[in-house]
């Protein structure tokens, strides 16, 4: 179970303590549990939504979004901000794009992108809450983190050394394929027909984002992987909100 605790510590702000420094093999296996962490987030959001029944829909949605950000420690939002700055500031140049991603400061483009993504998530949550489909909240965190597993499974990691390189190098790919299949089937069971359409939409967004990464960088980084999580969660929420 150590790989699960590694995944939970890395992807969440929950107080998880590991018994020692994980080995590279344990780090790679932790990727297999990313969809499980997404499922945990989704269940916590669903429980919170159930407890907030009766609250005004805008406040209900805002509190869910705040909990969502707190659970992840804004980890993927940080990656989205860095990627937005780098993508527009890099002017198509690979090395310049990678250099800007290392800058901890956020420019106006990053701020605008974050505001837009959070605003769209809030509006989508509002619709889902108002129409009594809060149970579908489980789907978005699962899809986002399963996509990260899929990205590391089939995309080169462009930075040598560090956490991301260890994850990509030591990921057991056959097991990862089974985990992805289980995640897809689970989303279909939970979401029914809308869940299936949502998966097709997510696949399209995933392939498009991966193509952009490979064209610009020749692969992925931790920041672009985080950006993918946020954008896929957004696609799922908006897609479901439009279907209900």
Curated annotation (Swiss-Prot):
GO terms, biological process: cobalamin biosynthetic process
Catalytic activity reported: alpha-ribazole + adenosylcob(III)inamide-GDP = adenosylcob(III)alamin + GMP + H(+); alpha-ribazole 5'-phosphate + adenosylcob(III)inamide-GDP = adenosylcob(III)alamin 5'-phosphate + GMP + H(+)
GO terms for cellular component: plasma membrane
Transmembrane segments: 31-51, 55-75, 109-129, 134-154, 188-208
One MF term in the entry's GO annotations: adenosylcobinamide-GDP ribazoletransferase activity
Membrane topology designation: Multi-pass membrane protein
Pfam families: CobS
EC number: 2.7.8.26
EC class of the enzyme, as a word: transferase
Recorded metabolic or biological pathway in which this protein acts: Cofactor biosynthesis; adenosylcobalamin biosynthesis; adenosylcobalamin from cob(II)yrinate a,c-diamide: step 7/7
Top-level taxonomic group: Bacteria
Keywords on record: Cell inner membrane, Cell membrane, Cobalamin biosynthesis, Magnesium, Membrane, Transferase, Transmembrane, Transmembrane helix
Record-linked InterPro entries: CobS
Cellular compartments annotated: Cell inner membrane
Cofactor: Mg(2+)
UniProt record similarity statement: Belongs to the CobS family.
NCBIfam families: cobS, PRK00235.1-5
Function statement: Joins adenosylcobinamide-GDP and alpha-ribazole to generate adenosylcobalamin (Ado-cobalamin). Also synthesizes adenosylcobalamin 5'-phosphate from adenosylcobinamide-GDP and alpha-ribazole 5'-phosphate.
Name of the protein described by the UniProt record: Adenosylcobinamide-GDP ribazoletransferase
């Amino acid at each position: 179970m150590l790989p699960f605790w590694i995944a939970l510590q890395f992807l969440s702000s929950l107080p998880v303590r590991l018994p020692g420094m994980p080995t590279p093999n344990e780090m790679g296996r932790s990727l297999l549990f990313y969809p499980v962490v997404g499922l945990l987030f989704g269940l916590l959001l669903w429980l919170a939504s159930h407890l907030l029944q009766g609250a005004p829909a805008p406040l209900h949605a805002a509190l869910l979004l705040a909990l969502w950000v707190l659970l992840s420690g804004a980890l993927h939002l940080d990656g989205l901000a860095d990627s937005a700055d780098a993508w527009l500031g890099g002017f198509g140049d690979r090395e310049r794009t990678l250099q800007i991603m290392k800058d901890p400061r956020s420019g106006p483009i990053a701020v605008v992108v974050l505001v837009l993504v959070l605003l769209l998530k809030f509006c989508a949550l509002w619709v889902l809450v108002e129409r009594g489909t809060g149970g579908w909240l489980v789907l978005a965190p699962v899809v986002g983190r399963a996509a990260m597993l899929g990205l590391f499974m089939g995309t080169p990691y462009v930075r040598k050394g560090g956490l991301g390189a260890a994850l990509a190098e030591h990921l057991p790919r056959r097991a990862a394929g089974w985990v992805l299949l289980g995640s897809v089937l689970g989303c279909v069971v939970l979401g029914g027909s809308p869940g299936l359409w949502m998966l097709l939409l997510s696949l399209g967004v995933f392939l498009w984002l991966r193509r952009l990464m490979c064209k610009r960088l020749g692969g992925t980084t931790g920041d672009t992987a985080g950006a993918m999580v946020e954008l896929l969660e957004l696609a799922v929420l908006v897609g479901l909100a439009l279907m209900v």
